[in-house]
Amino acid sequence: MSSIARTTAERFHFDRERLLALAEGNHASYTAGRPFPHIVLDDFLPEEVLDAVLEEFPRPGADWFAFDSPLERKLASKDDSIMGEATRHLLYEFNSAPFIDFLERLTGIDALVPDPHFEGGGLHQIEPGGHLKVHADFNRHPRTGLARRLNALIYLNRDWKPEYGGALELWSRDMTTSEARILPLFNRCVVFTTTDTSYHGHPEPLNCPQGETRKSIALYYYSKDDPAEAAGGDHNTLFQSRPGEALPSIEELTAPEAGTRRPAGERLKAGLRLVTPPIVVEAVRRWRARRA
C-alpha cells in the first residue's frame, strides 16, 4: 500500500452529515428488520481505510485470546498494542460523536455510550474449521454495569466466496428458523439490536482455504437503560440449540478434549464464564487485584 493511502487511512474521520443522511434513509428498514432490528450497509467506508487495516491485521498467534470449545472456536483481541496505527485510529472513530449520533438516528435508541475498553469486541478472527454457535450476547458491561444495546460489525474479507461459509445467521425468537444469512464481505457493516433473544452466530465450521481467515471488527454500544424487552437479570452469553442440535453441558465443556489448546484450569474458567454474569466476573477480578 502506498504511503499516501496509509496517511489517508490514519487521518480518516467520519463525515457527520453523510452519516446522518445514511441513518435517516435506513431507519425504517432497520426497525423493520426481522427477526430483530438490523441493517446491512455495503461499501460503508473508503476502501483505502479498510485496506490499511487489513494490511496490518495481526496473523493468528500467541497474541490473540483463543476461544476453543464445542460452542465457539475463534480468536479475539482488544489489545491495541498489537494493532497498527490505521486500526487504532479507526477503532477510535467508531467511538466518536459522529458515529454515535449516526447509530442513535439509525436505530432510535437514545443516549448510547461507546466502550473504550472494547470488552468482548475489538478484532475477531476465525480460522478454517472455526465457528460460533447461535447465541444471545452478554447483556451488561463488566466494568460499568451499563446495558448492552447494539452490535456493529465491520467485515474485512476480500474476495469471500459463499462456499467458504461464515455467514452471520439471525435466528427467530423461538429458535426454529434462521431468518437472515449475511455473508462477511469486505467493507460490509452490519448493525443490530441486542436483547435477551437476539439470537445470532455462524454455527457451521468455516470452510475457507488454509491460510485464509474470517476477519472482522466488533463494536458494542450501551446505555444506562435496559431494553424494553429485557427479561430481567444479568447474564453472560446465552447459547441456543438449533432444531436437532444438542449443546454440550458444562462438564463436557471443561473436559480435556473440549479445549485442547488450553490447560484444564483455563477450560474450567471458560466454562464457568459461560454461566456467570460478566459484572460478577469483573467484581471478582477487581477483588483479586486489591488483594494482590
Where are these regions (language model features)?
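N- or domain-start disorder-to-order transition segments that initiate the globular core
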Residues: 1-27
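Catalytic core of Fe(II)/2-oxoglutarate
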Residues: 2, 143-148, 158-292
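Non-heme Fe(II)/2-oxoglutarate
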Residues: 18, 22, 27-107
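Active-site rim elements
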Residues: 39, 85-93, 137-142, 175-179, ...
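Non-heme Fe(II) oxygenase catalytic core, chiefly the N-lobe of the double-stranded beta-helix
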Residues: 55-58, 82, 91-148
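Proline-centered turn/helix-capping motifs that create local helix->coil transitions or kinks
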Residues: 61-63, 110-113, 158-162
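A structural signal for the main folded, soluble domain(s) of proteins
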Residues: 72-77, 106-115, 119, 124-131, ...
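Eukaryotic charged/polar low-complexity linker/IDR segments
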Residues: 151-153
